[in-house]
């Protein structure tokens, strides 16, 4: 039996996710653990489910995800973009709706580097006039 699957890659901050969509009953597995077990936070789980809820396909696919790098927020954003790209490969007509919601565009914001002589990226040491 040949099982068709759609693949999508997502990135956010320093996280990258590989997403595989297969037809199924709505099971989401992240790094061989269930979605709720992996993230724990409901907000992160909501971010992951957003593209599926938008196109009403929550119970249509089983999703297998490998994600690495970054923290919880970055990983959730990377998975969301990966699911979006996989859905577009599955059905090209979903692209307009997903783009309108802002899920197709990669969030290019990165952590600003710390500068020499500053305490953080922009925080300067206290200035003394005299």
Swiss-Prot record:
Keyword Ribosomal protein assigned: yes
GO cellular component, one term: cytosolic small ribosomal subunit
Cysteine pairs bridged by disulfides in the record: none
Keywords (A to Z) from UniProt: Ribonucleoprotein, Ribosomal protein
Gene Ontology biological process terms in this record: translation
One Gene Ontology molecular-function label: structural constituent of ribosome
Family the entry assigns: Belongs to the universal ribosomal protein uS9 family.
Record's protein name: Small ribosomal subunit protein uS9
Lineage of origin: Bacteria, Pseudomonadati, Pseudomonadota, Gammaproteobacteria, Enterobacterales
Name of the gene: rpsI
